[in-house]
Amino acid sequence: MGNRLNLKDLPMGHAAQPPVFNADEYLAWEPAQLDRHEFLDGEVFAMAGAEDRHVTVSMNIAFALRQHLSDSPCRTYMSDMRLQVAAANSYFYPDVLVTCSAHDLASPLVKTEPKLIIEVLSPSTAAYDRGLKFSHYRSLPSLEEFALIDLDTRNTDVYRKGPDGLWVLHPFGRGETVSLASVALELSAVQLFADVLEL
């Protein structure tokens, strides 16, 4: 995901501090804002812009998924699609998500039943994505797989939910093909990092 700012921590003049929100107030307030905001059980976080390679990798993944799933009932969405995690009283904007749910396809503004979520890590959000955010994502009954892509190391960590409900880490190193079992897609490093310059 891109950089994440708690509005309470912004300097004066950058943005007006909103009141304490409940979920309905957040949903009514957010469409009128210039930037996207995530909602975490009453707290609101502004989603700052992401760097070039972050956006490029997200697009590469979404494009590969969209092509792969074109003849299926599944749909791929990027970071402008809001995801509700009801158990955490939260709304997020994942970098990429895939849903195969008829309920989600009928809901134009909010998805609730993703099969796959992918986050591209930023230095300011890596710990949050790996920790608190993943713990909330795991509460989604529909979620089968969660992938984290590290732009600096070019490693990808894929977490898969087993039949016993336990999540197992499947790490993929630099240059390795990433397997997304939930959608039966093998994603090569060339596809994943196309048009991304080495630092």
Regions picked out by a protein language model, each given a short descriptive name:
Residues 1-199:
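Gly/Pro/Ser/Thr-rich low-complexity, intrinsically disordered segments predominantly at protein N-termini
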